[in-house]
């Protein structure tokens, strides 16, 4: 296991955001966390990178684990000129060759001299991915990495994520609202709503009562289930897990 939680509970002020979260991620997995707004998805990722302290429970990391993180939003002063290369060098200096390699892995080679504020939404998301790839992390954390993209852009981004996993051998944890693509492009789904409602392989989770209570189902969901590839499924995730 690369990273995991054991009975993790997080409070912000008097409000409990996450309660009794227990989960783990194995090398090479793509795990997608889904849930309604305010369900604690971003908070869980922030806990994994050490930005939020749990009230109780434990966060477990493999020794020497390296992380790459792409946040949900990017705040840059529009009046401040900044090239992609400069952005990717902060807060520590990345070499030109490392930056070039990361941009290529993210599917946007040759953007080093472009101004950050001139990028399209799709290009910016790829640059955030490239920045997270610097240092070749063993675990990649992506928070709503496809927000603002059109359906084709979302599909292209998911293909790139799979390519990154295959090339680097890293595990990937994604927060996403793209339910249809999640069911095709991930190994395991964790359905979160302040606690883990259910988790498992996408086709199993999508039929669970807990998932249906949150999201319902339509023909597009059924088509997505049919298109899901089982090639990278693991036997110990072959059944549905529910919160006790």
UniProtKB/Swiss-Prot annotation:
Q: What is the top EC class of this enzyme, as a single word?
A: translocase
Task: Give the reaction(s) catalysed.
Answer: Zn(2+)(out) + ATP(in) + H2O(in) = Zn(2+)(in) + ADP(in) + phosphate(in) + H(+)(in)
EC number(s) on file: 7.2.2.20
**InterPro entries for the chain:** AAA+_ATPase (IPR003593), ABC_transporter-like_ATP-bd (IPR003439), ABC_transporter-like_CS (IPR017871), Metal_Ion_Import_ABC (IPR050153), P-loop_NTPase (IPR027417)
Q: Which residues form the ABC transporter domain?
A: 3-218
Q: Name one GO molecular function term.
A: ATP hydrolysis activity
Q: What is its main location?
A: membrane
- Output the Pfam families linked to this UniProt entry: ABC_tran
Please report the record's description of how this protein sits within the membrane. Peripheral membrane protein
State whether keyword Lipid biosynthesis applies.
no
Q: Which domain of life is it from?
A: Bacteria
List the Gene3D superfamilies hit by this protein, alphabetically: P-loop containing nucleotide triphosphate hydrolases
Q: Which UniProt keywords apply?
A: ATP-binding, Cell inner membrane, Cell membrane, Ion transport, Membrane, Nucleotide-binding, Translocase, Transport, Zinc, Zinc transport
Compartments where found: Cell inner membrane
List the record's Gene Ontology CC terms alphabetically.
Answer: plasma membrane
Gene Ontology biological process terms, A to Z:
response to zinc ion
Q: Summarize where ATP binds, as residue positions.
A: 35-42
Q: What does this protein do?
A: Part of the ABC transporter complex ZnuABC involved in zinc import. Responsible for energy coupling to the transport system.
Q: How does it assemble?
A: The complex is composed of two ATP-binding proteins (ZnuC), two transmembrane proteins (ZnuB) and a solute-binding protein (ZnuA).
Similarity-based family? Belongs to the ABC transporter superfamily. Zinc importer (TC 3.A.1.15.5) family.
Name-wise, this protein is Zinc import ATP-binding protein ZnuC 2
Question: Which source organism?
Answer: Hahella chejuensis (strain KCTC 2396)
Gene (UniProt): znuC2
